[in-house]
C-alpha cells in the first residue's frame, strides 16, 4: 500500500502546494481522496493512472476539495473507460456530480455510482474481499467525513504442518486457507485451525478531511488498528484562534489525535498558504512537541509534513520525496 500526495495545500494553491488530493495505490487499484483543482495534472508526475481509479472519496463540498472532479472524469472518459466508478461523499454530493456531468460536452461512457453518506456515526461503506472502508463524521463548517481504508488480511497457511497432516498440494490447500475444512482421501478431516497461523498486521490509512480535532475519532482509529493518519494541520499552533474560527486543526491538534489513535505515523497536510515560504515553522514546532513531550519521543512514532508528490510506502514505512 502506497500513499501519494497530489495536493497538500489549503483553500488557495501556491507555487509549492496544489489543492487537496491524496491517492492510495493498493493491489492494482487507486483510491482517490478528494479532488481539488489541478489533481489530474499532478497525476502526470506520479505513477498513478487515472484509469485505475475505482473509488473516489470526497470529504466535503468546499471547492478546494472537489473542483478537479469535472476535468478528471472527462479525461477518464476521453481515454475510453468503460468500467464503473464509485464516488462517496456527504449530502448533496449527488447533485454536485449531476451538475459536473453537465459541464464541457463530455464523453463519459462509464457508469458513475454516487453514494451519498448521511450518518452521524462511523459507518462501513465498503466491505470487499481484500479491503474495507469506513466513513467517519468530523467537525467542520459544512458536513464533512473522514475516510479510513483498511486492508483485510487472511490467516497464513502453515504449509509444513499441512504436509505433515497429509494435505496434498492443490485445491485442498486453498480451501483450508479460505477457512473451509477438507476431507482427505483416507477419510481424515482437516480443519482450518489445524494448519493456519494468525494473520499478519494489516495496513490501515485514515484521511481526516477538514476538521477540528476530535478525540473520539482518534479512539475509533485505535479500535480498528489504524497505522497511518493523514490529518489536516492548516495552522501552526500559535494560530489556534484562527483554527477554531474556521473549524480547522493546528499542528499540535493533529499530532495529539495521532497519539490517541496509537498510529505509527501522522502525516500533516492541508497547509495554509501563509506558510508557503516559511514551512520551517512546522518543522520547528514538531521538534518542540517531541522535545517537550516524552510520549512523543518514540522512535516508533513519526510525524511527517506532507509535500506535493511525496510518497509514503506503508509496508516499508519509507518516505520518498520528489
UniProtKB/Swiss-Prot annotation:
GO terms for molecular function: 3'-tRNA processing endoribonuclease activity; zinc ion binding. Binds 2 Zn(2+) ions. It is an enzyme of class 3 (hydrolase). The keyword Iron-sulfur does not apply. Its EC number is 3.1.26.11. It catalyses: Endonucleolytic cleavage of RNA, removing extra 3' nucleotides from tRNA precursor, generating 3' termini of tRNAs. A 3'-hydroxy group is left at the tRNA terminus and a 5'-phosphoryl group is left at the trailer molecule. InterPro entries: Metallo-B-lactamas (IPR001279), RibonucZ/Hydroxyglut_hydro (IPR036866), RNase_Z/BN (IPR013471). Belongs to the RNase Z family. NCBIfam families: PRK00055.1-3, RNase_Z. This is Ribonuclease Z. It comes from Methanococcus aeolicus (strain ATCC BAA-1280 / DSM 17508 / OCM 812 / Nankai-3).
